[in-house]
């Protein structure tokens, strides 16, 4: 099975947890892009849900496939958030934000009673950090913010390249108008301390470490099995 087929398997399994009248968070990324059309089929067959999307692209997909969309302003508490991940580490710690929607993804996850991560087995890691950590920053004073990030990382024994994410010749902008640094630090052995250090920097808006948010991971394996994991399974 190829990776896209595995992503679709995980998305199909996630649908089993969606019930009538649920308020759903809809994440972003390639695996969620497989989930949205499948959810649209269920809606067309009578499933009643209301959804909040974490990115403009996911919202557009929901409209395309007939998935009802609302906002957190109208429904500030959600039953279930379905999202992907760039890495799934010990105790279901995550790195997210490769697509640039990390701030909205974290807001929606925090507003949800449960967050289920859907992924293929390539996203499972023993230690976070092989995937670059996205750090969303305010455009004002980004060079000063970068220096502060480097110092915070150095204090935790982390070193490596920090690059400003680009979109052609211009900096990539998030839906919220922020920029993103991608930090290539390798193994992140103290994610909680790193999270606290980054959030203490005034120019940092949010980062891609999702700690204590995911309650289950639905992982499609290469042998066609699907594992439904909880944090203590890691």
Swiss-Prot record:
Keyword Isomerase: yes
Function: Catalyzes the reversible conversion of ribose-5-phosphate to ribulose 5-phosphate.
Protein name according to UniProt: Ribose-5-phosphate isomerase A
GO cellular component, one term: cytosol
Binding site for substrate: 28-31, 83-86, 96-99, 123
Keyword flag Glycoprotein: no
Family assignment from sequence similarity: Belongs to the ribose 5-phosphate isomerase family.
Pathway in which the depicted protein is active: Carbohydrate degradation; pentose phosphate pathway; D-ribose 5-phosphate from D-ribulose 5-phosphate (non-oxidative stage): step 1/1
SUPFAM superfamilies: D-ribose-5-phosphate isomerase (RpiA), lid domain, NagB/RpiA/CoA transferase-like
Top-level class of the enzyme under EC nomenclature: isomerase
EC number per UniProt: 5.3.1.6
Entry-linked InterPro entries: NagB/RpiA_transferase-like, Ribose5P_isomerase_typA_subgr, Ribose5P_isomerase_type_A
Catalytic residues in the record: 105
GO biological process: D-ribose metabolic process; pentose-phosphate shunt, non-oxidative branch
């Amino acid at each position: 099975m190829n990776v896209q087929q595995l992503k679709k398997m995980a998305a199909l399994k996630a649908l089993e947890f969606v019930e009538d009248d649920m308020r759903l968070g809809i994440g972003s990324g390639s695996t969620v892009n497989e989930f949205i059309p499948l959810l649209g089929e269920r809606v067309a067959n009578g499933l009643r849900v209301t959804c909040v999307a974490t990115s403009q692209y996911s919202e557009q997909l929901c409209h395309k496939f007939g998935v009802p969309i609302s906002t957190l302003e109208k429904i500030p508490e959600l039953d279930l958030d379905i999202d992907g991940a760039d890495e799934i580490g010990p105790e279901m710690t995550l790195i997210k934000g490769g697509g640039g929607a990390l701030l909205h993804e974290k807001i929606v996850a925090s507003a949800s009673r449960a967050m289920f991560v859907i992924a293929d087995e390539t996203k499972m890691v023993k230690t976070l950090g092989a995937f670059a950590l996205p750090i969303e920053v305010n455009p004002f004073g980004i060079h000063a913010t970068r220096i502060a990030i480097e110092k915070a990382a150095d204090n935790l024994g982390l070193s490596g390249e920090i690059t400003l994410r680009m979109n052609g010749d211009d900096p990539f902008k998030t839906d919220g108008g922020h920029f993103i640094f991608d930090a290539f630090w390798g193994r992140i052995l103290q994610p909680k301390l790193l999270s606290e250090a980054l959030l203490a920097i005034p120019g940092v808006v949010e980062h891609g470490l999702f700690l204590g948010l995911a309650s289950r991971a639905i992982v499609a394996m290469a042998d066609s099995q699907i594992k439904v994991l909880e944090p203590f399974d890691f």
